[in-house]
Amino acid sequence: MAGLSLAAAAEVSAKKAKEYIETPASDSRIEYTGRTLTNGSDVSYDWSGVYFRVRFNGPYLAVKCSDSKNSWFNLWVDKEMTPQADRKFIVAAKDTLIVLAEGLGKGEHEVILQKRTEGEQGCFTVHSFLSEGEILQAAGRKERHIEFIGDSYTCGYGTESGHRDDPFLAETENCNLTYAAITARYFGADFNLVSHSGQGIARNYDNAGPGYNMPHRYKQLFNTAKEPLWEPSMGAYTPDVVVIYLGTNDFSTGQQPAEASFRSNYISLLQSIKANYGEETPVLCMGSNANPYLYDYIRSAVTVSGLKNVAYMTVSDFAHDDEGDMGASWHPNYKGHIKVASCMIPYIATLTGWEMEEKPYK
């Protein structure tokens, strides 16, 4: 795996340049999952967890891309998104050529590339793909899809960190090890994340950015830009169920929002979800153990909303421990996220009618 400037890549690949087929990022044979913007031949996105699938013939695939800051990625070659990616790497340049696969055998292959860090770490743009063989039509979306709306827990803040007192590092943030990805893998579902660290329903962490909370950010096409707004017609998927895991930051730093404000904003978020996907789409509202009042706040919002197919649950104090299950800054590590997923998976099964199979959560 290598990341090179376009000039250096051109020099290294000069002998093979005539053999490459260049395919624009916007080609319909390439499948993107998550909120993205197509601008001409480019495709841009900044939300955690957005991923693309490319099927191709031949031994080689590279991507021409750029990033506004320093985004990290997970890569899989010829396999599904397992907990352990084949490789992880950073894109920290405006014009970069990343070799995704080389030296493969003859025949069809597939790569999956997932953005593992959140929007504050950078906005990623795919320009084109270089291959020696033909780009093939993507295999198609999975029959199941889950949308997760959340904060740093959903982003994967600190999931790869070794200790709860470790500081945040972008390279240890990995959305693929969160309860969301674990749940999607268990059900064999595609998934997308609408998540941002520090976000609350009515109050963000330490009251940062007052008046601008997840019910507002949820409407955006990009995590870090208030415009343009996202429309359901922009996505090629409709979730079978939506999960909200928010409220921890509302009760952060020893403070809490007024219940009426929390309830109003929560209902607004629920109404946005129902407007996007229809009244029959089930929504699961999860509360952490951050504060004993959080569950009551969520239950009140769901009840007062009067909306159909909305359920609520809480992750109890004993779902995970404060030692071995914690990563950076007291956020759950992979072990902790497995335990959170194990709490919610039965609810998802009941809401959707999906069977619970006898297999591990991973």
Regions found by a protein language model. Give the residues of each.
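Alpha-helical cap/lid subdomain in secreted, periplasmic
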Residues: 78, 216-361
